[in-house]
Amino acid sequence: MKTSQQVYEAAKSLLENTEIIDLLNNLGTVHIVGSYAANLMWDPDIDIVVITDTPQESAIKAINDLARKEKFQKFQFGDFKNHPKKNRPESFIINARKEWKGEKWEIETWFVTELGDKLEIVEKLKNLNNKDKETIIEKKKQRSLSGDTKHDLSSWEIYQDFI
């Protein structure tokens, strides 16, 4: 059975292999957020936020540049500025997918004009005691084993009891 640390190490090597952070740094201020940043990983996904004055243009450039690098198998583009969705920031998003170390990985990159309180939340999660961190990872594990997805029960919903 995999461990949270193994998922984290796979994520770290995926970020290095794809060089996605280097590419995104050319488009704005990059922050890795969510479970990777807090080292609370279970599922094979990474959340990144790019702060930029031009979210739409930056997202379009990113998807074109990433496609040319040929490091990912599949991309999705989302427009939550002109097509708002509940619980989603006014933003543009790229989902980049790749098989890596036997898992189907997804890197979600959000292009926004401001970050909000995401970094404060990550800091709170990093500072949790080990028991709470283990409980969060166990809840993520149970979500995965039950067949639920992060869209059925998001990690942010899991975190609410701890922050």
What are the language-model segments listed below?
Residues 54-81:
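A broadly used, surface-exposed interaction patch
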Residues 20-63:
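Active-site nucleotide-donor binding segment shared across nucleotidyl transfer reactions
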Residues 71-109:
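Conserved catalytic core of two-metal-ion nucleotidyltransferases
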Residues 1-33:
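Helical scaffold of the NTase/Pol beta-like nucleotidyltransferase catalytic core
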Residues 6, 10, 19-23, 58, ...:
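Exposed alpha-helical structural elements
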Residues 106-163:
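Catalytic cores of NTP-dependent nucleotidyl/adenyl transfer enzymes across multiple folds
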Residues 53-58, 101-103, 114-116:
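Short, charged/polar surface micro-motifs in flexible loops or helix N-caps
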